[in-house]
């Protein structure tokens, strides 16, 4: 892995699956983040077939929600990145993370993909693992055989509240990230939030 890029991102990608059947499922946490980011940016989102996804723009920054289904996300990311000459290190991918409890975040550059099929395909299309990832915790079902069923179901109410709170915290990182202050953003993202609601429930 190369040293982390400190350049602000030119492309923010939210991962998920298209269609109403998947809108409220855990695997769509990246889409949820981008929906809130589009509101914050005041950006209009439109489907662009050449990029295989829904695209928004804010100044010189792009947002992409691939509409290819999760395991082909790289097709969309690669197409937009090549067209606009965006380097992998200038890309931030926002996705759900099984190994983190609901309500928590992790920001990191490069590294492994943790079995996430969306990241695997993006890495294959970019030819490198060296891009930024913002991981939104959705928790783990406890049994590997239950993972597919788990990520394709909606969170419980208390989990949804924690995930929504984490997304708001993630939006709060953007002023740092947009200035290239990745170290400060990483420290803030990776710090444990105070008293997540789901942990207070007996």
Swiss-Prot record:
Residues engaged in binding tRNA: 22, 69, 71, 117
The keyword tRNA-binding appears for this protein: yes
Cellular localisation: Cytoplasm
Assigned keywords, A-Z: Cytoplasm, Hydrolase, RNA-binding, tRNA-binding
Reactions this protein catalyses: an N-acyl-L-alpha-aminoacyl-tRNA + H2O = an N-acyl-L-amino acid + a tRNA + H(+)
E.C. no: 3.1.1.29
A GO term for molecular function: tRNA binding
Site (Discriminates between blocked and unblocked aminoacyl-tRNA): 17
Chief subcellular location: cytoplasm
A GO BP annotation: protein quality control for misfolded or incompletely synthesized proteins
Active site positions, chain numbering: 27
CDD domains found in the cross-reference section: PTH (cd00462)
SUPFAM superfamilies: Peptidyl-tRNA hydrolase-like
Record function comment: Hydrolyzes ribosome-free peptidyl-tRNAs (with 1 or more amino acids incorporated), which drop off the ribosome during protein synthesis, or as a result of ribosome stalling.
HAMAP family: Pept_tRNA_hydro_bact
PANTHER family linked: PEPTIDYL-TRNA HYDROLASE (PTHR17224:SF1)
Protein name as catalogued: Peptidyl-tRNA hydrolase
Organism: Thiobacillus denitrificans (strain ATCC 25259 / T1)
Lineage: Bacteria, Pseudomonadati, Pseudomonadota, Betaproteobacteria, Nitrosomonadales
